[in-house]
A protein has these predicted regions:
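Hydrophobic alpha-helical signal peptides and transmembrane signal-/tail-anchor segments
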Residues: 8-15
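An N-terminal, well-structured beta->alpha segment
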Residues: 38-103, 107-108, 183-208, 212
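N-terminal small/polar loop signature for handling phosphorylated ligands or for N-terminal nucleophile
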Residues: 83-147
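Gly/Ser/Thr-enriched, mixed-charge loops and adjacent short helices
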Residues: 148-214
Length: 214
């Protein structure tokens, strides 16, 4: 009888050792946005020093992004930011992740300016030129196509994944009146700015190399 009583603890300890060996800790969160009976698991490993990044959908997915959005809204509140630009790269998972992010930010009272499919520099340009100086890029960066993640700047300052991790379990009530989600095309403004800042002698012959990989 004693053997069977201690068996669950031995089993748990062996699982813990196996998980710890791969430095793979999980945050268990009650999902209030969708199904109250469902527990959402988010692995700590996606919260990096400079960004948030993981394999889709095992490590980062729409439900995880909803919790990340809540943490971002808390960070925005701390910085007195009420509006933020969002964009995505060309990964297939980017569309649904961006929609989940925008919807959650709106529900937590943050106005979302969706600039759509853009490069990361263009997202940073949009953030810099806006009054709120804040932006979120859905991108897996240089990683393979099954990855995706988030790069973040708030109030003209980069925000690390570890900062968001500290806020992920914090509580915040959803707004009774969700904030706006608006679409904006900023590509022409970006191109004009680039052209204005690059002076080329029209008499000089130049060679131009274009990398179309991304």
């Amino acid at each position: 009888l004693m053997k069977w009583r201690i068996f669950p603890y031995i089993f748990f300890f062996s699982i813990y050792k196996h998980v710890s060996r791969y430095n793979y800790e999980w945050i268990l969160l009650q999902n209030h946005n969708y199904n109250k009976s469902k527990i959402v698991e988010i692995t700590n490993s996606i919260f990096r020093e400079y960004d948030i990044r993981g394999i889709y959908p095992e490590e980062i997915n729409e439900e995880a992004v909803c919790y990340i959005a809540k943490a971002i809204s808390i960070k925005c509140e701390q910085e007195n930011i009420k509006e933020i630009c969002v964009g995505r790269d060309g990964r297939v998972s980017g569309v649904s992740l961006l929609n989940a992010l925008s919807d959650s930010l709106s529900k937590y009272g943050i106005k979302v300016v969706n600039i759509g499919l853009v490069t990361t520099p263009l997202l940073y340009f949009a953030a810099k030129k806006s009054d709120h100086k804040s932006g979120i890029m859905i991108t897996g960066s240089h990683n393979p196509k099954n990855y995706n993640g988030i790069k973040l700047v708030i109030n003209d300052k980069p925000v690390s994944g570890s900062e968001i991790l500290k806020l992920i379990s914090s509580k915040k009530q959803m707004s009774k009146n969700p904030a706006e989600i608006v679409d904006k095309d900023i590509k022409d403004d970006y191109i004009s700015e680039v052209v204005e800042n690059i002076k080329i002698n029209s008499n000089r012959k130049i060679k131009i190399v274009i990398d179309c990989g991304n």
